[in-house]
From Swiss-Prot:
The gene is T19H. This is Tabersonine/lochnericine 19-hydroxylase. Gene3D superfamilies: Cytochrome P450 (1.10.630.10). Heme binds at residue 447. One of its GO terms (cellular component) is endoplasmic reticulum membrane. Keywords: Alkaloid metabolism, Endoplasmic reticulum, Glycoprotein, Heme, Iron, Lyase, Membrane, Metal-binding, Monooxygenase, Oxidoreductase, Transmembrane, Transmembrane helix.
Length: 507
C-alpha cells in the first residue's frame, strides 16, 4: 500500500510542479503590468506615507514613482493620477469606465445613502439627478434669476466693510465672506438668510463641520474590520450629530416652503423665480418625467447645492484676497482696470465685468494655486481596464491630484508663483477641457456649480477693488503668510484672513 501511495505521489509531482510554475508565471505577469507602487506595510498598506497635507505627500511620491501610481490604503487599491495626460485618459478617453464613486461611510450616512449627485453611483438615478441639477437648478436662466439676491447681499457686505473702515477696525475677511456666501446661497436655495434665524446658526455649524468630515480619514473605509475605532475617536458621535442636525433643518425648510407655496399659490415651473426647494417641490408635485422618486432625493440634492456652493465660494474669495494682499503689484493693476471700466458709478454691471480681463485672470490664477478640491472627489473603475499600458482592476479608487497638476512646471512657468498674466494669453476656462487646469474636474462627474459660484466671486472682488484700498493690518507683512492648505474635502487655509479697508473717494 505504501508503495502504491508513493507511486501515486510520484505521478502527481510533475502536475503540482506545473501548476506552481503556471501560478508563479501568472502572478509575475499580472504584477508586471501594474502601475509603479511603493512598498506597502501589512494591514495599513501605504497609509503611513500620507501626511497631514495628502496632496503634497502624494505629489512627492509621484515624483519618484510616476504620474500613474498604485497605492494601497489599507486593503483598498488606489490609483493616483498626477499628470494632465493621465487625467485626460481617466476623465475623457475612459470617462465611463471611471464614472463610479466610492461608497464612503460618512457620505452615505449624511447624503441619504448616496441619493445626492456627487456621490451617487453611475447609472440611471445619477443621470436623472444631474439632469435636474444642471437644467433646473443651475441653468443660466435660473442663475440669472438670482442676480438681485447677489447684488443685495454684496451691497450689505460693502456697508459692513465701510462701517468697519470708519471705525478703523480690522476686518475679519473670513467672517465677512462666509456670511456673504451663506446668505446668497441660503436665499437662493431656501428663500431665507442663514444669518437672520436661530435655526440657521445650527446649519452654519453643519456647513462648517461637514466638508472636513466628508474629507477626513475614516479607517473603516479602508480597513473594514477596524470600523469600531470610530466609536473611540469621536468620529461616529460627530457624524451622528451632524446628520441629525442637517436632517432636522432640511425637513423644516421643505415643510415651510411647501406650506408657503401652497398659501401663495406659487407656480415655480422653471420660470425666472423660485428658490431651489420650491423648484424641486414643484417638479415632484407635477410628477415630471425623470424626477427621482427615491426617498431622500430632495434633501440630498439640496445639501449638495448648499455644501458645494457655500464653502467653495467663500474659500475662493479668501484665496483671491489673500493673494492680492501678498502681491500688491497685482492688486494695483486690478484696481486700475476695474476703476477705469466702472468709473464713478456705484453699480457694476455684467457688461462691465465682461470687460475685466485681468479680473478673470486673477480668479483663475487663485484657483490654479488653490483649487477648492486639491484632490478631486475619487472615481472608481467600473471594469478591468488598461490605462496608459497599466492594468487597473475593477473597483480601484482613482484620485486625481488636481493641485499637483496645477503646480507642475512641465505645464506652467514659475509654477509656484502667483502670476495672473499667464491666463491673458490662453483660453483656459472652468469646463475642464484643458487638463492642466481642472479646478472643477472634467467629464461626466465634473462639478456643474461653477456657473453659480464664479459670478459671486467676480462681482464681489470687482466691488472691493473699485470702492476700497485694502491692505494688511499694521505689524503684519506678506512674509507672515503661509498659505498652507489644510486637510479635508476642500482647500482650507490655516491662517485667518484679516485686512483693513480705506474707502476710495471717487464718487
Amino acid at each position: 500500500m505504501l508503495s502504491s501511495l508513493k507511486d501515486f505521489f510520484v505521478l502527481l509531482l510533475p502536475f503540482f510542479i506545473g501548476i506552481a510554475f503556471i501560478y508563479k508565471l501568472w502572478n509575475f505577469t499580472s504584477k508586471k503590468n501594474l502601475p509603479p507602487s511603493p512598498r506597502r506595510l501589512p494591514i495599513i498598506g501605504n497609509l503611513h506615507q500620507l501626511s497631514k497635507f495628502p496632496q503634497r505627500s502624494l505629489r512627492t511620491l509621484s515624483e519618484k514613482y510616476g504620474p500613474v501610481m498604485l497605492l494601497h490604503f489599507g486593503s483598498k487599491p488606489v490609483l493616483v493620477i498626477s499628470s494632465a495626460e493621465a487625467a485626460k485618459e481617466v476623465m475623457k478617453i475612459n470617462d465611463v469606465s471611471f464614472a463610479d464613486r466610492p461608497k464612503w461611510y460618512a457620505a452615505g450616512r449624511v447624503l441619504y445613502e448616496f441619493k445626492d449627485m456627487t456621490f451617487s453611483p453611475y447609472g440611471e438615478y445619477w443621470r436623472q439627478a444631474r439632469s435636474i441639477c444642471v437644467l433646473q437648478l443651475l441653468s443660466n436662466k435660473r442663475v440669472q434669476s438670482f442676480k438681485g439676491i447677489r447684488e443685495e447681499e454684496i451691497r450689505a457686505m460693502l456697508e459692513k466693510i465701510n462701517q468697519a473702515s470708519n471705525n478703523s477696525s480690522i476686518i475679519n475677511g473670513d467672517e465677512i465672506f462666509s456670511t456673504l456666501t451663506n446668505d446668497i446661497i441660503g436665499r437662493s436655495a431656501f428663500g431665507r438668510k442663514f444669518s437672520e434665524e436661530e435655526s440657521g446658526s445650527k446649519l452654519r455649524k453643519v456647513l462648517q463641520d461637514l466638508p472636513p468630515l466628508l474629507g477626513s480619514f475614516n479607517v473603516g473605509d479602508f480597513i473594514p474590520w477596524l470600523s469600531w475605532v470610530n466609536y473611540l475617536n469621536g468620529f461616529e458621535k460627530k457624524l451622528n450629530q451632524v446628520s441629525k442636525d442637517c436632517d432636522q433643518y432640511l425637513e423644516q425648510v421643505i415643510d415651510d416652503t411647501r406650506k408657503r407655496d401652497e398659501e401663495n399659490g406659487a407656480n415655480n415651473n422653471g420660470g425666472n423665480h423660485g428658490n431651489f426647494v420650491s423648484v424641486l417641490l414643484h417638479l415632484q408635485k407635477e410628477d415630471v418625467k425623470g424626477f427621482p422618486s427615491e426617498k431622500g432625493f430632495l434633501k440630498a440634492i439640496i445639501l449638495d447645492m448648499i455644501v458645494g456652493g457655500t464653502d467653495t465660494t467663500h474659500l475662493l474669495l479668501h484665496w483671491v484676497i489673500t493673494e492680492l494682499l501678498k502681491n500688491k503689484h497685482v492688486m494695483t493693476k486690478l484696481q486700475k482696470e476695474v476703476r477705469e471700466i466702472v468709473g464713478r458709478k456705484w453699480e457694476i454691471t455684467d457688461e462691465d465685468k465682461e470687460k475685466m480681463k485681468y479680473l478673470h485672470a486673477v480668479i483663475k490664477e487663485a484657483l490654479r494655486l488653490h483649487p477648492s478640491l486639491p484632490l478631486l472627489v475619487p472615481r472608481v473603475a467600473r471594469e478591468d481596464i488598461n490605462l496608459m499600458g497599466y492594468r487597473v482592476a475593477k473597483g480601484t479608487e482613482v484620485i486625481i491630484n488636481a493641485w499637483a497638476i496645477a503646480r507642475d512646471p512641465s505645464y506652467w512657468d514659475e509654477a509656484e508663483e502667483f502670476k495672473p498674466e499667464r491666463f491673458l494669453s490662453n483660453n483656459f476656462d472652468f469646463k475642464g477641457l484643458n487638463f492642466e487646469y481642472i479646478p472643477f474636474g472634467s467629464g461626466r462627474r465634473s462639478c456643474p456649480g461653477s456657473s453659480f459660484a464664479i459670478p459671486i466671486v467676480e462681482h464681489t472682488v470687482a466691488h472691493l477693488m473699485h470702492k476700497f484700498n485694502i491692505e494688511l493690518p499694521n505689524g503684519v507683512s506678506a512674509e507672515d503668510f503661509d498659505p498652507t492648505d489644510a486637510v479635508g474635502l476642500v482647500s482650507h487655509d490655516q491662517n485667518p484672513l484679516s485686512f483693513v479697508a480705506t474707502p476710495v473717494t471717487i464718487f
